[in-house]
Amino acid sequence: MPENSNIPFSSVFLEKNPPIDAHIDEILQWCKKLYGFSSNPVMEGNLSFRTGMGFIITGSSLMLNNVTKDTVVEVRGVVFGLNRPSIYTKGQTAPSEEALLHSVIYEAFPEINAIFFLTSHNIIEAAEKSGIPSIDTNRPAGSQELAREVANLFKSNNNTGPLIIKNRGVIALGKTISEAAQLTEEIQKKLESGVRVKSGKK
């Protein structure tokens, strides 16, 4: 598969077979659920969880409802070169362009085992109204610089609750997949509640 030129790193495929892990089914279930939540589907995003070799993340340029066992990738290492980083993977496709963000967070927070990053104007709006901390940055999407800024903000907030990356999305961390999912669901429910109020529904 040709590599997306917009991805800010090079993918080095150690193995072309898709990764195998018991938690993949759980991630796929959440991809479908978050995409189809009420009347406000989250169209895109990237979900990951830590493994013994690194972490498994959804593939590049995928709608959440299109993620399958063949389009998740295990990131096993990152090497920062002179031009751009190289990410060493097991799988059939390149990892999400935010793979560096996930990698830096996992390195900074050993207790974190799952990351949900959802991109949708509606979910950002709902998160902002909820008073969730935010970061407004001009750093390129998927860059090492952005990843470090986000990790630093999580550190300053004692790694509690989700975080908004303005004009991009909402990121939630969890010690488990369920914990990251629960934080995301809470924002989605607030979004749904807001829609009902605006439309006059109860």
Residue ranges: model-predicted function:
Residues 1-202:
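Glycine-rich flexible loops
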